[in-house]
């Protein structure tokens, strides 16, 4: 029942009693997204989720958040729902790519009942939200969705074109490949 959150759960004692940054997408940003989130974590002392606005029709692929602005690109999260129907959308802000959780998340996970046989990380984070202990950062950066094949290919191409040791050979390869299309 804990497959979705198993990697997070296994990290609870390594090292003990520290905040936990977690990410599952590649994000290209001058100001690293994890740093954007940890700065807010240190300022407010709450869990923090990295969010961006997505097109309304894409929200059901992710989650929806009920938020109020705090400052610049920082919001207070009041509620969230994973994979909502179009009629359940609270906003077009969705959690994308990064979160920083306080150590208490492990106790919350332990006490979160499974839904459809699975303990969801979103449900555990929503407990923090309902306690007023979750912030959202509308992060600055270009996100590559590692949840789909095209996102993986785009990230590899973009990063390959910037890699100091590979960029010239990779660019030549891409030009040759494109000429054959």
Where are these regions (language model features)?
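Conserved beta-loop-beta/alpha segment of the NTase-like Rossmann-fold superfamily
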Residues: 1-64, 109-110
């Amino acid at each position: 029942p804990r497959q979705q959150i198993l990697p997070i759960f296994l990290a609870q004692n390594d090292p003990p009693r520290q905040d936990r940054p977690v990410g599952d997408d590649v994000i290209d940003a001058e100001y690293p997204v994890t740093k954007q989130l940890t700065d807010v974590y240190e300022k407010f002392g709450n869990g923090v989720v990295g969010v961006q606005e997505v097109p309304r029709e894409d929200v059901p692929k992710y989650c929806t958040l009920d938020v109020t602005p705090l400052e610049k690109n920082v919001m207070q999260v009041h509620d969230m729902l994973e994979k909502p129907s179009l009629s359940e959308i609270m906003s077009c802000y969705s959690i994308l790519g990064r979160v920083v959780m306080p150590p208490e998340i492990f106790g919350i996970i332990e006490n979160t009942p499974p839904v459809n046989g699975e303990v969801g990380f979103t449900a555990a984070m929503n407990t923090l939200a309902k306690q007023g202990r979750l912030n959202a950062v509308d992060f600055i950066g270009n996100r590559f969705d590692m949840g789909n094949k095209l996102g993986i290919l785009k990230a590899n191409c973009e990063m390959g074109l910037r890699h100091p040791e590979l960029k010239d050979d990779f660019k030549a390869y891409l030009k040759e490949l494109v000429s054959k299309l």
